């Protein structure tokens, strides 16, 4: 046999090779992505030494041709019956290009102006905008400026934080080839890759980056193709006549031709980009929660305004007075600073995570990560090292591991570029076999025959230092065994032990290689078996264990075989309920009803042999079941599911496309940083949850109190003071972002019924306290005002104090004294309290200054209200009866949900069948 580079091509290739234009060798071939550069340098140095010593170089003697093409989504079969020796005619190319377009993905640009304007859309924003219009109509320019400033602040912060430079689709395009070599009108020509059409015949050879999907049409063809850009897996895949190839794959070894079956958006990569665009649509989970809260508060504002307007109608109040009442209710009815405070809280958390080498690209992902219940993890490069390593070899009696290793390395390629992953693993492992490493350079390679798909082995003929001629082989264990058996009988015990070991390694997911040699004119000797596997990262098992303790279920999604996936899961302590992704029935091909399929995915520990659509589908099914899902990955193949997941996590070494699609990018290797991220996200969630309870209670407090004050007494707090109350409440609690917060040992979610129940009760207690203050302040005995004071000033101080102190109650997991607030939060609240006190003492924005004794009485009364609030909150936090009353527990799955799942699955199958028929 001869090297692929020097061997003749297939008959069809030979017939057109004379027409091949001069081509430059590609500057780069795809290599093992996770290999360390120092190890690669060592291997290159070793290969140079071997080549310089013996003058043997199995680098391709031919010029590496420009990248070729191949395509995806099936076109009519008659379009694919192109003559491989002649190709398409120029006229046919024009017809097909008109029908299918260029081989490129569609550009979908999002307007930055529209994106910015959308930050002014939402229930809370609408109320703020209405308040700004009212303030302008009343010529209240101070309030108008403050409200507009808050609107711009909220929009500006959100826009900057959510804006991501670069397009995910552009990153996906970078994986595609720029040119292709095709047969047109019987000539082999080089064309831009985007001009390839379905039915084109493309040339494939070492180094070719395939720009389309296609099917191999060269008979007796053997290719090894790196599909890591599609599947993320490190091992090259063997391809033969009739096999499918995919866009962005790279030919590692072999020559042949393929017919294009799909181009542009119809390729696997194109469809992956479409999935990313689809997943990018829709509202985030956190946005939905805030909008839901805003809608309810808006309804309450309208109800309060109806009450006020009705009272004003019977009193025949003037329109200006009614509008001022309306402005006051509108300002206090919704938490105008809610978006800014929660965004600041998450931004501070993101800065902390950055110190832990976790870069947050989408702030709302922090909230989603806190509630994640299922972690879907890619295997290669995420749970494993993405590089093959050799395990303990099995040797027959009388053979040393060094002998086996030396023979295997002698039967290894001497390429520097595009070195086979298995050969690289052997050469890297030489450092563990010093005797074999020292002896290797003393042998002279006479002949080298790369992997033969028929004999399933690699063969090298070498000369020992003593001048002895030795034939070395490594390959499929049973084929190597057959080679030896054809030469002479093997002892039964050796034969049985060898086969048993091969079967054991296969069941454990190892890729085993048999090794044998023949000295001179002697007999073949079976030496043993060398198992290899992509090993788990050193910290992955511990990380997975910690994730489980934090309430996460971990599912593995990998492009590897089921056996390999199960062995990896066994080593990591994951479950071994791993299934082939075919059982997901993509494209309507599954037989399971929708509800049964959802149960199947929910209970599985993972899936093997997956493509991007499978990962996307798994995430989608779990989300439809109500789970918050996180997805980790590092390759182009992971981009759609990273974008679809509630929290997409790109691990260290991820491709640009994966980083762009992810919400959080880890710079540290493996998943260990995710533990800190989970804990931090739950701390941040606790801060946000406590602030939202606090802020809703404040809005309800003022709606109830001011609504009754206006309706019953036909009076209200000054509008300027209302604005200051709203500002003070949010300024003081901005420091909640730095508060000392606990983290939950389980995933946390927005328990909205319980949240509203707590907020309503706290708001009512606050309103009662304010009403008592209002109605008793002028009593001759026991009234708050003793000598002199202003009603507006006293009410402003009482409301400010009790509202500001409420955050100390809602922030604690237990009684308010059980957790000490951070100095930032305590300092901010105290500073606002001092300012509010000065407002009252010196009559700023009120009629008159207030006596110091009156101010002290307000402080004492407010402390009493604070204690009552603390008691109510503690009882609600610890009461199971309150939980049941608020219906905060997750509802059990209803039969109607399963019926909908079954119906949708049936409709999908019908739709797919209809598409095939038409």
UniProtKB/Swiss-Prot annotation:
The chain crosses the membrane at residues 116-136, 141-160, 292-313, 326-347, 720-738, 755-774, 825-845, 858-874. There is a cross-link at residues 252, 555 (Glycyl lysine isopeptide (Lys-Gly) (interchain with G-Cter in ubiquitin)). Residues 1-18 have a biased composition (Low complexity). Mg(2+) binds at residues 634, 638. Changing residue 638 to N: Activity reduced to 24%. One of its GO terms (cellular component) is plasma membrane. It comes from the Eukaryota. SUPFAM superfamilies: Calcium ATPase, transduction domain A, Calcium ATPase, transmembrane domain M, HAD-like. It catalyses: ATP + H2O + H(+)(in) = ADP + phosphate + 2 H(+)(out). Residues 33-47 have a biased composition (Acidic residues). Phosphorylated on multiple Ser and Thr residues. It is found in: Cell membrane. InterPro entries: ATPase_P-typ_cation-transptr_N, ATPase_P-typ_cyto_dom_N, ATPase_P-typ_P_site, ATPase_P-typ_TM_dom_sf, ATPase_P-typ_transduc_dom_A_sf, HAD-like_sf, HAD_sf, P-type_ATPase_IIIA. Changing residue 129 to L/Q: Normal activity. Its EC number is 7.1.2.1. The modification Phosphoserine is found at residues 61, 911. Keywords: Amyloid, ATP-binding, Cell membrane, Hydrogen ion transport, Ion transport, Isopeptide bond, Magnesium, Membrane, Metal-binding, Nucleotide-binding, Phosphoprotein, Prion, Translocase, Transmembrane, Transmembrane helix, Transport, Ubl conjugation. The plasma membrane ATPase of plants and fungi is a hydrogen ion pump. The proton gradient it generates drives the active transport of nutrients by H(+)-symport. The resulting external acidification and/or internal alkinization may mediate growth responses. This is Plasma membrane ATPase 1.
């Amino acid at each position: 046999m001869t090297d692929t580079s020097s061997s003749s091509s297939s008959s069809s290739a030979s017939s057109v090779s004379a027409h091949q234009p001069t081509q430059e060798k590609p500057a780069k071939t795809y290599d093992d992505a996770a290999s360390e550069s120092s190890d690669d340098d060592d291997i290159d140095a070793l290969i140079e030494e071997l080549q310089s010593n013996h003058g043997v170089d199995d680098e391709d003697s031919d010029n590496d041709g420009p990248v070729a093409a191949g395509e995806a989504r099936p076109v009519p079969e008659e379009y694919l019956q192109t003559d491989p020796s002649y190709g398409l005619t120029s006229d046919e190319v024009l017809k097909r290009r008109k029908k299918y377009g260029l081989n490129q993905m569609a550009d979908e640009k999002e307007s930055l102006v529209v994106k910015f304007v959308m930050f002014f859309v939402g229930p809370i924003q609408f109320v703020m905008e209405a308040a700004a219009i009212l303030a302008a109509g009343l010529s209240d320019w101070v309030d108008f400026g403050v409200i507009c400033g808050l609107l711009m602040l909220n929009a500006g912060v959100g826009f900057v934080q959510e804006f991501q430079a670069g397009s995910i689709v552009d990153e996906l395009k970078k994986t595609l080839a720029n040119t292709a070599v095709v047969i047109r009108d019987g000539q082999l020509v080089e064309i831009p890759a985007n001009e390839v059409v379905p039915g084109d015949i493309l040339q494939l050879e070492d180094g070719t980056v395939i720009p389309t999907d296609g099917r191999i049409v060269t008979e007796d063809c053997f290719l090894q193709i790196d599909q890591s850009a599609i599947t993320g897996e490190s091992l090259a895949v063997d391809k033969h006549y009739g096999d499918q190839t995919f866009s962005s794959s790279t030919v590692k070894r072999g020559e042949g031709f393929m017919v294009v079956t799909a181009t542009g958006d119809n390729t696997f990569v194109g469809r992956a980009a479409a999935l990313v665009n689809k997943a990018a649509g829709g509202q985030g989970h956190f946005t939905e929660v805030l909008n839901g809260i805003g809608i309810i508060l808006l309804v309450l504002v309208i109800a309060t305004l109806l009450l006020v307007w009705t009272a004003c109608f019977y009193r025949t109040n003037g329109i200006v007075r009614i509008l001022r009442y309306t402005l006051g209710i509108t300002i206090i009815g919704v938490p105008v600073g809610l978006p800014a405070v929660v965004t600041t809280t998450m931004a501070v958390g993101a800065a902390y995570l950055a110190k832990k080498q976790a870069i947050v690209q989408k702030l709302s992902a922090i909230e989603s990560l806190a509630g994640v219940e299922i972690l879907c993890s890619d295997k290669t490069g995420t749970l494993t090292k993405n590089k093959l390593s050799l395990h303990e070899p099995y040797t027959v009696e009388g053979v040393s591991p060094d002998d086996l290793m030396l023979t295997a390395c002698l039967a290894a390629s001497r390429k520097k570029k595009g070195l086979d992953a298995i050969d690289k693993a052997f050469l890297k492992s030489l450092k563990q076999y010093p005797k074999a490493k020292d002896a290797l350079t003393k042998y002279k390679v006479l002949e080298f025959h790369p992997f033969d798909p028929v004999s399933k082995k690699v063969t090298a003929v070498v000369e020992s230092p003593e001048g002895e001629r030795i034939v070395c082989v490594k390959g499929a264990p049973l084929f190597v065994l057959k080679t030896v058996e054809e030469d002479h009988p093997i002892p039964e015990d050796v034969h049985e032990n060898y086969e048993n070991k091969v079967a054991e390694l296969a069941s454990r997911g190892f890729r085993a290689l048999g090794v044998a040699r023949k000295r001179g004119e002697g007999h073949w000797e079976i030496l043993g078996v060398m198992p290899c596997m992509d090993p788990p990262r050193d910290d992955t098992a511990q990380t997975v264990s910690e994730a489980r303790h934090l309430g996460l279920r971990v599912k593995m999604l990998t492009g590897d075989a089921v056996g390999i996936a199960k062995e990896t899961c066994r080593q990591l302590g994951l479950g071994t309920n791993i299934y082939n992704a075919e059982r997901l029935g993509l494209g309507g091909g599954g037989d399971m009803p929708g509800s049964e399929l959802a149960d199947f995915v929910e209970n599985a520990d993972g899936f093997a042999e997956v493509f991007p659509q499978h990962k996307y589908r798994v995430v989608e099914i779990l989300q439809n079941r109500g789970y918050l899902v996180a997805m980790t990955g590092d390759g182009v193949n992971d981009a759609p599911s990273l974008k679809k997941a509630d929290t997409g996590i790109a691990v260290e070494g991820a491709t640009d496309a994966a980083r762009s699609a992810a919400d959080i990018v880890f710079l540290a290797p493996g998943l260990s940083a995710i533990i800190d991220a989970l804990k931090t996200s739950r701390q941040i969630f606790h801060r946000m949850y406590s602030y939202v309870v606090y802020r809703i209670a404040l809005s309800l407090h003022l709606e109830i109190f001011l609504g009754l004050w206006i309706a019953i007494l036909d009076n209200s707090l000054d509008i300027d003071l209302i604005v200051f109350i709203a500002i003070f409440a949010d300024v003081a609690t901005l420091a909640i972002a730095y508060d000392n917060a606990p983290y939950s040992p389980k995933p946390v979610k927005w328990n909205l019924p319980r949240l509203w129940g707590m907020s309503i009760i706290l708001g009512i207690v606050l309103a009662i306290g304010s009403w008592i203050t209002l109605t008793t302040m002028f009593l001759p005995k026991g009234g708050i005002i003793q000598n002199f004071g202003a009603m507006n000033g006293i009410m402003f101080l009482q409301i400010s104090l009790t509202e500001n102190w409420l955050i100390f109650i809602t922030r604690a997991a237990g009684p308010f004294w059980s957790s000490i607030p951070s100095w930032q939060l305590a300092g901010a609240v105290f500073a606002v309290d001092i300012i509010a006190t000065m407002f009252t003492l010196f009559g700023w924005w009120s009629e008159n200054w207030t006596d110091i004794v009156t101010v002290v009485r307000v402080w004492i009364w407010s402390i009493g209200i604070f204690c009552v609030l603390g008691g109510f909150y503690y009882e609600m936090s610890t009461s199971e009866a309150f939980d049941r009353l608020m219906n905060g527990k997750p509802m059990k799955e209803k039969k109607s949900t399963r019926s909908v799942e079954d119906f949708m699955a049936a409709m999908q199958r019908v739709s797919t069948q209809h598409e095939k028929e038409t």
